[in-house]
Amino acid sequence: MADIDDEDIKEILLTLPGWEVGKPLAPLDSHWDRQLDELIKYHRENGYGIYAKNIAFTWRDEEITPVNSIDPIRLTDLKNYELQRNKVIDNTESFIAGHPANNVLLYGDRGTGKSSTVHAILNEYWQKGLRMIEIPKSAVADLSLIREQIADSPMKFIIYIDDLSFDSNDTSFSELKAALEGSLSGKQPNTIIYATSNRRHLIKENFSDRENDVNKGDTMQEQLALSDRFGLTITFLNPDKKEYLDIVEKLACDRHFEEHGVDVDKLLFKADQWATRRGGRSPRGAKQFIDHVEGCIKRGKEW
């Protein structure tokens, strides 16, 4: 390599096809040898190929595919649930720094911000080398293949599984158990698994299972073992009325409703009516109500 000079490189470049290229991902210098250390440092920090140009991916047809449009939500957009969220933040920061970190199960009521927390974590830490690959539950059996494809990348990857649960006759959960812990291929320093679920026990058991299984105790232990393989389990429950209205008020403050003369007492009264009509209080419901009010304000309509 030391015997190659700038003229040699120019001759090589002239033989290449006329590819259309965009802006270089790393700074270039006419004396490429002086830039070698900087290029190595740049790609060690920013990755290469699709991992340098994108931060979110899906698993499709046995390929890691970039996601061009991602949820822009930030941690500051999420209200309350600080204890739960801080546990995810601390674990993620430890993972990014190369320190021991746990696979995480976020479980609890619908609409409480489990998925939004994971999306916000990516938006907060992608500049520190964090990337995310979302896979459907049906692709759990491909976990070892996914990890193999990113094994040599310098980036840190959250493998994200949303709304995770299994039927009792679904054997693919064995692959997840192996990936979480226990198998020789189950550990990889640049990957971690974050999953969300509405169920604490991820494997659904039906009555026929209980009647027909003479080894019910062993079956139950196997089912419980899957949840226990997540080193960190974080619970998100629906807020009570006071907490719900507090979320509504904080979201209204972010949207500067006071500048439009919105009466706070009326806002909170209407917010509680909104929740009652929709069968319960949740952070998602609070945001939907605030979106409704903002839309009415901007159109000059009564809300």
Model regions: which residues?
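Interdomain "pre-motor" coupling segment immediately N-terminal to P-loop NTPase/helicase cores
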Residues: 6-66
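N-terminal pre-Walker A segment at the start of P-loop NTPase domains
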Residues: 68-93
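Walker A/P-loop
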Residues: 103-133, 137, 145-152
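Loop/turn-to-beta-strand initiation segments
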Residues: 130-131, 154-158, 187-194
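Conserved P-loop NTPase "ATPase switch" module shared by AAA+ and STAND
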Residues: 136-137, 152-172, 176, 199
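Conserved catalytic/switch belt of AAA+ P-loop NTPases
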Residues: 168-211, 218
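Conserved AAA+ ATPase "SRH/arginine-finger" region at the nucleotide-binding site
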Residues: 213-224, 231-245
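C-terminal alpha-helical "lid" subdomain
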Residues: 237-303
